[in-house]
Amino acid sequence: MNESVPDSVEDNGNSVPANGLLVLPDNDHEEGGVGSPQRSNSVESPGGSVHSTRKGFGLKKWRRIKRDGPVRDEAAPVDDGSKLLKRGLAGLVNPPSKHVEFSSVEARQSSEGSVGSVNMVHHPGVANGFSPDIGCMFAVGQAFEKSEEHSGNTIGGKNVVGGKVVSGSQEKLWSDTIKRASEERGDIEKEKPCSSLDSDLRSSDFVFSTGSVSVGNHGEKDERLTMNYIGGFSNEGQVKEEVQTYSRSENGNKEDDGESKKNNNHWADKDALADSIRSFAVLQEVLWKEVQSFQELGKESVLLHSNTDELSSDQPSHQNCKEDNSTSSGSKALILKEKVKLLEHKLEEARAALEAKEARIQELENSKIESELECIFQRKIETEIEHLMLTRSLSSLQVLQETKKLHSLKEDPVSNRGNILGKTCKLGFYILTQLILLVSILRFLVLQFSPASRLVIPT
């Protein structure tokens, strides 16, 4: 950037020289009064040297050279954005007995690889480089704001903005720079969120622990005090608020009372600090979510590549398998056809053997049945013959008996009468004895089963 800044900025006898040592003022004072004799030292930069000049008394002020525009590095958008923000740091009151010493160290600058000196803060308020004392850090910002006020005023019409005296041209340039920086930052964050995350963390941690003061860019002396701006230009509301404050200053809102300026700046800076802390927390969450999403996308891309490789490697194997399957299926079909033919031939032979066996079984059964039938017919014939023989024998016997009776009847009947009478007497006697015995037995049974009669004889 084409910019010329005085060697040192004085405020009531206190200066911020270019050798890296800064002594804060004991009391806070506002500009706008009668100037005091001031001196400046020459500081060498990589591009050349600026001769020391002497500032006069009264209304003689330094004139700021117009900037061409901020040079941004894509690798560190947060550092450039934090360098462009120079507002609201003059209100916090630093204890009067404390001094902040800056020791210059070499560090990398984000714009086009320039190398300058980065001044680190040595103060009890900073613990382990990550828990700074707010009063300490913003006291350094107060000194830097006062140097800005000394270098930013012109002899012509002045505007009072938040306790600072700025010119109309500077105000217009400042608003344009803020808009350009916010637009460029939004584009870079959209295109490269990962690189912006790395640069944000690197710049925020380094500035948070050191409170750096960078000097020198392409041979031009550019002394800046880079404070712990956490929210950066990501919060568009702060940019709009700053532009509105500058526009109100153009309308003529002026405050002449120095004490009221200090109080207003004090509370405004406290609000800015709270807003910056909130915006930093939101920014951290958003960036962390973006990192997680990019990690997931990377994993998905790796999985997709692996799947495509597997598919591409599996395709020739599938083709080979198909060819092998086709050849093997053809040979298998031939083998199966031969097996089917053999099985059909065996089946025909088995059928023929079965038919022969069935015929043999049927013949045996028929022969057996025939033999049984022959036996039955033979028995039948035998029985019929026996029957005929018996009938003939009976008939012959009857004829013989009839002949004998006839012969006995024809004999003498007187001799036979006595025999017949004797036989009839005997038969009658037997029948009579049997009747007597029967009656006696019946009587005995009746007497035995009948109850005995009991006669009552009076005495």
Swiss-Prot record:
Residues 1-78, 240-266, 308-330 are annotated as: Disordered. Residues 52-66 have a biased composition (Basic residues). It comes from Arabidopsis thaliana (Mouse-ear cress). Residues 1-17, 308-319 have a biased composition (Polar residues). Residues 331-375 form a coiled coil. One of its GO terms (cellular component) is nuclear membrane. Signal peptide: none annotated. This is WPP domain-interacting protein 3. PANTHER family: WPP DOMAIN-INTERACTING PROTEIN 2 (PTHR34562), WPP DOMAIN-INTERACTING PROTEIN 3 (PTHR34562:SF9). It is found in: Nucleus envelope; Nucleus membrane. The gene is WIP3. The KASH domain, which contains a transmembrane domain, mediates the nuclear envelope targeting and is involved in the binding to the SUN proteins. Expressed in seedlings, roots, stems, leaves, and flowers. Component of Ran complexes at least composed of WIT1 or WIT2, RANGAP1 or RANGAP2, and WIP1 or WIP2 or WIP3. Interacts with RANGAP1, WPP1/MAF1, and WPP2/MAF2. Interacts with SUN1 and SUN2. Core component of the LINC complex which is composed of inner nuclear membrane SUN domain-containing proteins coupled to outer nuclear membrane WIP and WIT proteins. The LINC complex also involves nucleoskeletal proteins CRWN/LINC and possibly KAKU4 and the cytoskeletal myosin KAKU1. Interacts with WIT2. Residues 67-78, 251-266 have a biased composition (Basic and acidic residues). A motif (Nuclear localization signal 2) lies at residues 63-64. Mediates and enhances the nuclear envelope docking of RANGAP proteins mediated by WIT1 and WIT2 in the undifferentiated cells of root tips. As component of the SUN-WIP-WIT2-KAKU1 complex, mediates the transfer of cytoplasmic forces to the nuclear envelope (NE), leading to nuclear shape changes.
